[in-house]
């Protein structure tokens, strides 16, 4: 059985120095930058900057949009989740990161810094949060910030997440291992997996027309061309 390996195709270059989170929308591609904490909305066809929003977040790693158009950002290095008005760019609310902690490789090192969450997705009023320290996806009720469910993810360093076409399934990227898996959230069952060439690091991830988009924190943004049906 051959390994399933995606073919990355660079489509544009991020306007920020360190893109770390993506969210697809009809208006364009939303990008949060870990280097300058700015949000950019980019044109799908050419990467032109359609909007730029300055945020008060701290080295962020995930972004999504809710049903009312508000922007949610995983502010990784102060272990918070920000809800931001798309219209004004002002912070509406700040929540604690549900998965904040110390990454597994650093937990025995004295003085290791706590960090927060990464990839975000939205569905039916709930926020789904991928956390490298906890190695879970946390489903949060945004009305009272209560955890409804948590899903153990495969791998070591979960980052970008994106809804799959299959109901209840999500694509999950592990940056350190260079793999993307399709898992069922209710029980962590894995239904598909593919590798990414070592020249590419998948940090942020989103999906448009059943094609996965990625950002590498060295500025490339592109697509992962791969058969979305398991062949093993």
Across the structure, where does each feature detected by a protein language model lie?
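A short beta-strand motif characteristic of beta-propeller blades
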Residues: 7-13, 48-53, 90-95, 100-110, ...
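Short loop/turn segments that connect beta-strands within beta-propeller blades
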Residues: 43-47, 85-89, 141-145, 184-188, ...
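Blade/loop signatures of beta-propeller domains
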Residues: 1-5
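Blade-level signature of beta-propeller repeat domains, shared across WD40, Kelch, NHL, RCC1
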Residues: 201-232
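Beta-rich, blade/repeat-based domains predominating
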Residues: 13-26, 56-67, 99-124, 153-168, ...
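Conserved beta-propeller blade signature
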Residues: 28-31, 70-73, 126-129, 169-172, ...
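Short loop/turn segments immediately following the C-termini of beta-strands
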Residues: 34, 76, 132-133, 175, ...
